[in-house]
Amino acid sequence: MVVIRAGSAADAAQIAEVQRDSWFGAYAGIIADEIIDRVTAVDGGARVRQSFRTRPWQRMIVAVPDGEDGGIVGYAAFGPETDVLGAPWPHPLSTDGEERRVAELYALYVRPPWWSTGTGRALMDRVLARSVAAGYSSVTLWVLRDNRRARRFYERAGFAPDGATNVLTGLGDVRELRYRQQL
């Protein structure tokens, strides 16, 4: 059982550790270990602290074990849908002329020992509830095409591929798929 709370810059080092552990667990055989090591070896805590300063639209939540003094075991980052540079899109108009607000799940990572414990689902439920409360009509996310475990998780949470794809050249030319859920 975990407690979900707002993340803060004070959590940056632990959030970066969760990301590193998750990448090595989830992306083994998809992204080369040397690439994961290179990408996550930089001072992740500083990178996360910077995102709190430079991405004011981003919301971060963390999962901590209930009743334990343990550290952060998972986190999610979300906010308005972003462009390829990570800046929020202006709110595009839907086909009927009404403003369409789209949220994006930027990241959801859980330490491997906490996989299949309900931690990821608790984070996802909070992201979806907060997106509804903020007035978003749908949520998107990007997932590596070959990350079958994550794709099953997102599909069980109500997401489906919407046809958009992207190639991450800096990570060894891996393909990612965009998933979407109407709220």
Which residues does each PLM region occupy?
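Acetyl-CoA-dependent GNAT
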Residues: A6-A9, R20-W115, R121-R126, R130, ...
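C-terminal "cap" of GNAT-fold acetyltransferases
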Residues: H91, V102-A103, S137-T140, L144-L183
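Enrichment for repetitive, rod-forming helical segments
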Residues: A12, A26-Y27, R156-G158
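Conserved SAM-binding loop
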Residues: I4, S116, V143
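Hydrophobic pocket/interface hotspot
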Residues: I15, Q19
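Conserved N-terminal entry element of GNAT/NAT acetyltransferase domains
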Residues: M1-A13, L177, L183
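A residue-level detector for conformationally permissive "hinge/kink" positions
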Residues: Q14, V110-P112, E155
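Charged catalytic carboxylate motif
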Residues: Q14, A122-L123, R149
